[in-house]
Structures are given as C-alpha cells and as structure tokens.
Swiss-Prot record:
Protein name: Inactive beta selinene synthase
Domain of life of the source: Eukaryota
Residues of the signal peptide: none
Keywords carried by this UniProt record: Cytoplasm
One Pfam family linked to the record: Terpene_synth
Function: Inactive selinene synthase.
An annotated Gene Ontology molecular function: terpene synthase activity
InterPro entries reported for this sequence: Isoprenoid_synthase_dom_sf, Terpene_synth_N, Terpene_synth_N_sf, Terpene_synthase-like, Terpenoid_cyclase/PrenylTrfase
Location(s) in or outside the cell: Cytoplasm
GO BP terms: terpenoid biosynthetic process
A Gene Ontology term for the protein's cellular component: cytoplasm
Chain coiled-coil ranges: none
Length: 297
C-alpha cells in the first residue's frame, strides 16, 4: 500500500509541475487535494501553484465568468493566507448590487462554492460576502427541493450544518473521497486512489499509536490495549449513570438527556468498539432498516 501511495504521489507531483497547466487548472488541482485531505503530501507544490493563482488577478481569472471557478480561487487563496478582495464577486451582481438570479440560479455547483467561499470573510465590512451567503443559501434550498442530485445534495446539506471552511478536515475528506468520483467532470482517478490509500494509511497509523500509547502507559500488549479501552468505555458509562443520579435537580432535564443520548449515539456508531460504522455506513444498514423500514412484530 505504501509503495503504491508513493508512486501516486510522484504522478500527482507531475500534474503540479506540468508546464502547460493554467492558473485555473492550478486552483482546481489545489482545491481537489485539499478537499480530499492529501495536501500535506504536496506543501511545496501547493505553495508554488498558489503563487501563480494569486498573481493571476487580471489574467485568466480576470476574464473568467464562471462562478464556481472564481469562488474556488477565492477560497483556496484565503485558506492559505493569501489576500484576495471580495470585489471579485462584483461581476456576478447587477446594477443594484444584488446577485444576479438570471446568471446564477441555474448553477448549483457555483452557488455551493460561493456559499463556502463567503465563509472566509475576515471583516464585518465585507458585506458582499454576507449577501452571498444569504443569496446562495436561499437558492440552494430551492434546488434541494427540485433538481439537485447526489452527491451535491449531501454536500449542500453538510455545508448548511457547518460551512466547509469550519468543518473537520478529516471528516470532510472521508465524505468527499466517496463523492469525488461521482462528479460529472474534473475528477482524477490517480488523485482519488491516492486519497483512499492515504486515508487508510493514516487510520492504520492512528490505531497503531493508540495501541502503543496504552502499551507504554500500562505495559499492555496490543490485544490487552484494546481490552483496556473497552473496559474504559464500560467505566465511562458507569460514571455517566452515576453523574445522572447525582445531578443537581436545578439542572435542566434536557441537558441530562442530551449527554446520555450523545453517549448512546457514539456507542451505536462504533457498535461497542467492534466495528467502525461512522466510516463504513454499511455497518449500520441493518439497524437503520429495522428502525425505519421494518414494521414492529
């Protein structure tokens, strides 16, 4: 797995180094590797690419009238600490300063990119970004009721809960790895394969570190470490039960319910430590089916 990942890293570096790559292609490539959670493999290449993207204020991007492209450039530059003015979105507004419905409402992909990019506002004076959020959200809601399809409907739903710039990078990459190959255009098979391999390699590393921590702390073997963690879970439940019994009566009952329900959710998602149903949703299939589809006996 490691050898294949290293080979793919070399192939992706070639994409960054391609002399014919335009500033727009560079921005899209950076966005893809960041979104898929493999940007740590290409820090130098990303820095070089972003310099060309940043310097292209009046070039390709200056004449570009594609909302998705302009929003992606805005997002990746601000994510990496490079200043770009919110005025770049003025071309999508009418004479009254409002975002143009005729230009944008039929472009849900662009609206989602605008919605996420606008959450990179840095001052209250950037009112255009506040307007962008309100405009994009209202029209994306309409699109979700109508023509929006998977995987975009899931991406919009996540962004409404927590906008992309504020969402957990690890969790978003997990979702996006499953969605990237379904996109109608622009996906790269080698980048996707690398993202999958890197995700598994990092997860394996985390599991190994967890075993090593328990082994170092308590002198336990790998199997003993997992058993110890399972025992910690049992003890945590006992402490939760005790805390609920001893909770101040003045405490809102809803708070007690929320604490216990959160713990229950974690227990179900990870199925008592036996399977990871958060990463692999199929592990919850039988439970969800029994809860929502099967009639009571």
């Amino acid at each position: 797995m490691g050898e294949r990942a290293n080979f793919l890293k070399g192939e992706v570096r070639k994409k960054f180094e391609a002399a014919a790559m335009s500033a727009i292609d560079a921005a899209m490539l950076v966005d893809a590797v960041v979104h898929l959670g493999i940007d740590h493999c290409f820090r130098e290449e990303i820095a070089t690419a972003l310099r060309s993207v940043h310097e292209d204020e009046e070039g390709e991007f200056g004449s570009c009238d594609d909302l998705h492209t302009v929003a992606v450039r805005f997002l990746v530059l601000r994510q990496h600490g490079l200043w770009v003015s919110a005025d770049v979105f003025d071309k999508f507004r009418d004479d009254k300063g409002s975002f143009s419905k005729s230009l944008l409402c039929s472009n849900p992909r662009g609206l989602l990119s605008l919605y996420n990019a606008a959450h990179m506002a840095v001052t209250p004076e950037e009112k255009v970004l506040d307007d962008a959020i309100a405009f994009a959200r209202s029209h994306l809601v309409e699109a979700m009721i109508g023509e929006l399809r998977s995987p975009m409907v899931e991406q919009v739903s996540r962004s409404f809960d927590i906008p992309l710039p504020r969402f957990s990078r690890r969790l978003e990459s997990m979702h996006y790895i499953a969605e990237y190959g379904q996109e109608e255009e622009g996906h790269d098979a080698q980048i996707l394969e690398l993202a999958r391999l890197e995700f598994e390699l990092v997860r394996s590393l985390h599991l190994r570190e967890l075993r090593e921590i328990c082994s170092a702390e308590y002198g336990a073997t790998g199997e003993e470490a997992f058993a110890f963690i399972a025992n910690m879970t049992e003890n945590a439940w006992r402490k939760i039960n005790q805390a609920c019994m001893e909770m101040d009566p003045a405490m809102l009952p809803a708070f007690k319910v929320a604490v216990v329900d959160l713990s229950r959710s974690i227990e179900i998602i990870y199925l008592g430590g036996k399977r990871d149903a958060y990463t692999f949703g199929s592990n919850l299939k039988d439970l969800v089916t029994s809860l929502f589809l099967k009639p009571c006996a």
